[in-house]
Amino acid sequence: MTNQTPMMQQYLKIKSQYQDCLLFFRLGDFYEMFFEDAKVASRVLEITLTKRDAKKEDPIPMCGVPYHSADGYIETLISNGYKVAICEQMEDPRQTKGMVRREVVRIVTPGTVMDQGGVDEKQNNYILSFIQSASMYALSYCDVSTGELKVTHFEDEATLINEITTINPNEIVVKEAIGESLKRQISLTTETITVLPDISDVKYDVNTTNDSHLYHVTQLLLDYVYHTQKRDLSHIESVITYEAVDFMKMDFYAKRNLELTESIRLKSKKGTLLWLMDETKTPMGARRLKQWIDRPLIQKKQIESRLDTVDQFINHFIERDTLRGYLNQVYDIERLVGRVSYGNVNARDLIQLKHSISEIPNIKNLLQAFDEQMTAQFEALEPLDDLLNLLEESLKEEPPISVKEGGLFKTGFNETLDSYLEASKNGKNWLAELQTKERQRTGIKSLKISFNKVFGYFIEITRANLQGFDPTEFGYHRKQTLSNAERFITDELKEKEDIILGAEDKAIELEYQLFVQLREQIKAYTERLQKQAKVISELDCLQSFAEIAQKYNYARPTFSEDKTLELVNSRHPVVERVMDHNDYVPNDCELDKETFIYLITGPNMSGKSTYMRQVAIISIMAQMGAYVPCESAILPVFDQIFTRIGAADDLVSGKSTFMVEMLEAQKALAHATEHSLIIFDEIGRGTSTYDGLALAQAMIEYVAHTSHAKTLFSTHYHELTTLDQSLACLKNVHVAANEYNGELIFLHKVKDGAVDDSYGIQVAKLAHLPVEVINRVQVILDAFEQSNNQTNNKNTMNHVDIPTDKNLNASSDEVTEIKATYYVDNEQSAATQHAKSDGQFEQAAFDLFDSPAKQSEIENEIKTLNLSNMTPIEALVKLSELQKQLK
């Protein structure tokens, strides 16, 4: 380090304190990066990597970005998971002898972005921390841009993971390193995990109901936030304590499978429930809507309160339309307040704040048209006339973005400022008059008086007009020679310049001071403004519910006390929207305490998965307090929704499709209650037919005898349909389809009863598989069916000889015949009830473990073999004999 220049020594010293960050080191008009930081930044930002001291043996890699456009570059680095430490010059280089003092003034991390362009206005930007003790987990999270701060605790890791995936933080702070298994699961949400082993002695004022775990996890989070931001964050609200059990529970897979906020295929908002329901007019309302989708209510009183408000908005559609107009003029009050506190607010932001609070009286007056209950619900809406007057009297309507270049305040706001501006204005008028006078005096019509920051004011004459011109005759002193012009000054011009520029500089400096004072005055309104933002966001969500309810003809749900679920002409809200409404086929669903399992059969592509999803989504919408896409809807209040839909490997955790399926099924079977909803789509596909069939049947029986959860179970195992003979709680339904002239027609209608055909070949035709494959499938299928029809003994395993299709084996001339052997168990499903000691019963849809007689004899023979006394040749001979017996 001693071999480095003083500037590089300063850089290395500062960098040593911020090893986990890319250091933006201010040098004049640029932020420079060196060494590995430069290599990373040049690659991610796609900027040129150069070298400092290129002529030396070991030049230093470097790159840089202009300070005035740094925000965009920082945003790119943050979006790629990096942290950026911003190191500024703390002294004016022009007035400093020796090395300029530099300090890191802020660390930008994925969870602490405050710049307007760095965050999605319709998404929260959360940073989260959690700690673990012997008996519990404590978790706290914050959106630094809005000031939201919440904390909770729970006992198990599963709830921790559910909370993290629900909150979806961009950054996580922990006190100590976490295990690899937990880290892999968390990585589904974020890979930015910071270990902060030492907490400062600063104690932050947080109200955590004297719970030490909640206190310490909140201290950990705030310590990191203040350490990185290094400035006032007074807008961060008093911490709100909540319980995870106060909301409907859905894990990461349930939310993904139901596509609540992100589509599986596009990985975007489009095509999701959030996309459908977002008729909000404010960024605050959009963020609140996502929170409500992620956390449906389970308290009936709270749900009904929201529904009552939606009902009011539907019945007052003129007032609702007027309200939407008012809300459209409201900007992001939450984040505007955050920037006021943070100190990066500009004058245009404050004009947005002014327009926003000017709509509050209009909104409050409009609510008088509704009933007293609704008016009381939003009584916290408070006109801020004093703040509105302050902003109205002070700032120009269209101020510049920069707060350090003047032009911010209205005439009359400050007398001293007015005097400076008047002097500057008079000076400029004098300059205009001087330019006219000099043109007349010299006879040069193109003469002009201009200004730049290097020379100040000057007279410019083009070279074409200089021929025969004697500057001294007019008292001109040459200042600069250009290729096509000469620049001059006069004593009079220089004297006036001092007056004009002095006034301008003083005006700009005073305006900045006044702006800082104004910002501090607005800080006093932080808590009141945040209350207004909360009320407006809720109003926005509820009017959005009313808007979509009326637009798409939704119905108000009612909630049953006896666990009844009755949906009449229900639709999938998203699918219905993306297709012609008249083409969508609505369906009913009716479950209660006695019949709580639907076993759903039907062809592939017929709509089984869509039907099951729509029941789950309708339940979520209802518990959000929204109307639902049905003719009528009676629902229980669900505590949890479990899903297993579709096939997906969990590559992050190293789990196969089948393992993921089993893990999701395990969660449902272990944790579902009689108040839960389970969606199982074709459980058992990822293993052998018998294994899958046995698993599916066992899971159905388990739900029937234990949790009694409302369950929709789709399957292609048609043997399961006889379960309705032994399980009174199970009802067979199917999604209908017709075959006409060899073509499969999907009716998409759910009807009572089971079907015994999945129409696999017809669906394969619709997928345009090669005709040779389709024909071959039919040959093989005919052979299987013929063998079954010829067999009467249920304990006989049939050998099926299938004719070879030589067209499919043309690559080998030597092969003339292939025999495919398929053993078909012709046992018919017996409605045999096996009594249990406790009086319960279980039914096998078919006997999974009954072996043919011949096979049992061979098994017994194998069991009696003394393998220790057999030579390899004897064993091979015996194996050959057994094989012949099976044939």
From Swiss-Prot:
Task: Supply the NCBIfam families for this chain.
Answer: mutS1 (TIGR01070), PRK05399.1 (NF003810)
Query: Which function does this protein serve?
Result: This protein is involved in the repair of mismatches in DNA. It is possible that it carries out the mismatch recognition step. This protein has a weak ATPase activity.
Could you say which residues bind ATP here? 602-609
- UniProt keyword annotation of Cytoplasm present: no
Output the Gene Ontology terms for molecular function. Answer: ATP binding; ATP-dependent DNA damage sensor activity; damaged DNA binding; mismatched DNA binding
- Keyword Membrane attributed: no
Q: What is this protein called?
A: DNA mismatch repair protein MutS
Cellular component aspect of the GO annotation = cytosol
Which terms under GO biological process does the entry name? Answer: mismatch repair
Q: Which UniProt keywords apply?
A: ATP-binding, DNA damage, DNA repair, DNA-binding, Nucleotide-binding
Q: A Pfam family name for this chain?
A: MutS_III
Family from the record: Belongs to the DNA mismatch repair MutS family.
HAMAP family assigned = MutS
Q: Which PANTHER family match?
A: DNA MISMATCH REPAIR PROTEIN MSH1, MITOCHONDRIAL, DNA MISMATCH REPAIR PROTEIN MUTS FAMILY MEMBER
